[in-house]
Structure formats: structure tokens, C-alpha cells
Design a protein with these regions (language model features):
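Flexible coil segments in periplasmic/lumen-exposed cytochrome c-class electron-transfer proteins
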Residues: 12-50, 60-65, 70, 74-149
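Sequence/structural segment immediately N-terminal to covalent heme-attachment motifs in c-type
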Residues: 1-13
Length: 149
């Protein structure tokens, strides 16, 4: 889902060394990314540019699936300066049958669904969020000591 939705065009998955950028200062990671970080990845997504945040450790920084669902549904509710498009095709609006779904996205204001309806992620939306939550390269490696500054 990450590749299919083109996330790698704007997001990278590598933390640059302190001498090469401010990734560590931005708290995107505590150490640089090294080749061993990608050893078990089926596909490596280094990225083609970095218009958005680096996602190497996004699963460490953000642990709530709701945060990702709200971001994907309407990025501008998270930040007005973001250039990320909405990925609303990863969601469906449906009538509430009995109780709300545990997966219902908590939306407010103009983007909230009408009364009696809820916005829920599709299986593709859930898969993308599960992938993003899994991005955690915060384990120690001898060839990339953590920066303590």
C-alpha cells in the first residue's frame, strides 16, 4: 500500500548522519540509518525526495492508529502547511448499524460525517496504517551508535 499510493515520492526512510542533515535534531531517530536496517525488508523505500517527514521511525513517534487515519483522511487538519493530498479512497462513509465501529475515524467539524454515519478505513487503509506503525528502526547497532547530543 505504501508503494501503491506513492508515499515514497515525498517521504524517505533513512536517517542521515548528524554531519549530513538535521534528521536527528528533528527527533526522526537517535542514530543514522545503515545497510543492516534494510536486511529483512522485502522492498526498500529510500524515497525519491523529502517533501514530507522521514518515516523511518514513525511507528515510534506516533503509536495511535487514529492519528494516522486522521492524517490520511485530511492532512490539513493536522497542519495547514502540509502539501500532502488526502487519501480518502482509503476510507468509506457508511451508516452506523447499531454501535459505531471500533475502527471509526474520530473526525470533527466540517469533515465529520453526517449524524448516523461514520468514516471507517478500508482494508487497504488499515494495511497502510499497520505498515506505518511497524516502521521502527530504533534498535541499537554497533556500526551506528546513538547520538547523545
Amino acid at each position: 500500500m505504501y508503494a501503491a499510493n506513492g508515499c515514497f515520492y515525498c517521504h524517505s526512510q533513512y536517517i542521515r548522519d548528524k554531519d549530513e542533515g538535521n534528521d536527528i535534531d528533528r527527533k526522526w531517530g537517535t542514530r543514522r540509518t545503515v545497510a543492516r536496517d534494510y536486511m529483512f525488508d522485502q522492498q526498500v523505500f529510500l524515497g525519491t525526495s523529502r517533501l514530507g517527514a522521514d518515516l523511518t521511525n514513525v511507528g515510534v513517534r506516533q503509536t495511535d492508529p487514529q492519528w494516522f487515519y486522521r492524517l490520511l483522511y485530511n492532512p490539513h487538519t493536522m497542519s495547514h502547511e502540509v502539501s500532502m493530498p488526502a487519501y480518502r479512497w482509503l476510507f468509506e462513509t457508511r451508516e452506523i448499524q447499531g454501535q459505531s465501529s471500533v475502527d471509526a475515524v474520530k473526525l470533527q467539524g466540517a469533515i465529520a460525517p453526517p449524524p448516523g454515519y461514520e468514516v471507517v478505513p478500508t482494508s487497504e487503509g488499515k494495511a497502510l496504517v499497520e505498515y506505518l506503525l511497524s516502521l521502527k528502526k530504533n534498535y541499537p547497532l554497533p556500526e551506528a551508535p546513538e547520538t547523545t547530543e
